[in-house]
Amino acid sequence: MGNCLDSSAKVDSSSHSPHANSASLSSRVSSKTSRSTVPSSLSINSYSSVESLPTPRTEGEILSSPNLKAFTFNELKNATRNFRPDSLLGEGGFGYVFKGWIDGTTLTASKPGSGIVVAVKKLKTEGYQGHKEWLTEVNYLGQLSHPNLVKLVGYCVEGENRLLVYEFMPKGSLENHLFRRGAQPLTWAIRMKVAIGAAKGLTFLHDAKSQVIYRDFKAANILLDAEFNSKLSDFGLAKAGPTGDKTHVSTQVMGTHGYAAPEYVATGRLTAKSDVYSFGVVLLELLSGRRAVDKSKVGMEQSLVDWATPYLGDKRKLFRIMDTRLGGQYPQKGAYTAASLALQCLNPDAKLRPKMSEVLAKLDQLESTKPGTGVGNRQAQIDSPRGSNGSIVQKSPRRYSYDRPLLHITPGASPLPTHNHSPRVR
């Protein structure tokens, strides 16, 4: 029923510029917890490497992917109980996300509570640009398979309706865990686990022969499964990396204010190092518990990067930017290593930033390093809190002037500087 359009439109490696209002809420794909998760029966036989990823492809080729289920609109209506309000998981500029149920074998709609739970993203009618962003996501997630990329189960295209069906991520987004009022604070170990998983996802995209630049790496697009394994979602802004002797891709400035690399904002020249910068911002959010942009703060403190950067290379002052909700329960050496890594990722000179594979290696090394016993006297060691393995966890000093409830205010996306196009930001 109209699931595959016969069109010559291509998802091209250099010129498409999807609009900025869609897919800003993939972070809320799974804001409610469910005991049901996507079983192995939904594993998609897509590329585990993008070495031979065929681009550009026609729309017909993309939508005829054998890896995806072509749902009818009626099937998804049944799966979500006619998109009822009590099935709504979240909404944003792009549209709405609903909780749905499908049979694990046939992938047909099933009764609520039976089969497996999925997240159904229903896009608003946004015309050609909205369709292009939707198609870009189908193109990439329909071909790629990796433990740290969210799994796309299928899609629906009928008339003006554009929907995507994903595996359900019961722990929701990293953004919600860090910034939502009342959320339980993440432990140091979980924060590093999330960072490592996200780094694995980006490394997979960057190191492929047919490189993919994610272009919208942020806490809202990092989804978490029941064990806090992180997966990248929302590939609507993804771009094919430079080929041949090219060093960058020239494109209209798109992304999210506070996460976008400064050289990309200024020139429109996109490289994998742009993603590295964005990763540095998210790593900083994990360390500090503060948003990339917070308009409720004053002056330089509105920008997390501007505010935190002076402290990242100073062991004695690093505690000033650490999330007070950690209660000082983090290894000082590990925190300094992570902060130093964030500082490298945020280098204003893109060429001096590390590759994501190098970032991942550092994080893996950090996770495998056991916390030391510090330099305190014997009594201090006895009184020190201990981790699950019995090792002493350094309790870093608190900056009590920051011990107040965080303001959970969604930052507005300020206009970014332009080069020769008017940027669209989320």
UniProtKB/Swiss-Prot annotation:
One of its GO terms (molecular function) is protein serine/threonine kinase activity. It catalyses: L-seryl-[protein] + ATP = O-phospho-L-seryl-[protein] + ADP + H(+); L-threonyl-[protein] + ATP = O-phospho-L-threonyl-[protein] + ADP + H(+). It holds the Pfam family PK_Tyr_Ser-Thr. ATP binds at L89, G90, E91, G92, G93, F94, G95, Y96, V97, K121. Residues 1-42, 367-426 are annotated as: Disordered. It is a lipid-anchor. Its EC number is 2.7.11.1. Residues 367-394 have a biased composition (Polar residues). The keyword Nucleotide-binding applies. Keywords: ATP-binding, Cell membrane, Kinase, Lipoprotein, Membrane, Myristate, Nucleotide-binding, Nucleus, Palmitate, Phosphoprotein, Plant defense, Serine/threonine-protein kinase, Transferase. The modification Phosphoserine is found at S250. Coiled coil: none annotated. Residues 83-366 form the Protein kinase domain. GO terms for cellular component: cytoplasm; nucleus; plasma membrane. Strongly expressed in leaves, moderately in flowers, and barely in roots. Residues 7-42 have a biased composition (Low complexity). One of its GO terms (biological process) is defense response. The modification Phosphotyrosine is found at Y166, Y264. May be involved in plant defense signaling. Interacts with the Xanthomonas campestris effector XopAC/AvrAC. PANTHER family: OS01G0588500 PROTEIN-RELATED. This is Probable serine/threonine-protein kinase PBL3.
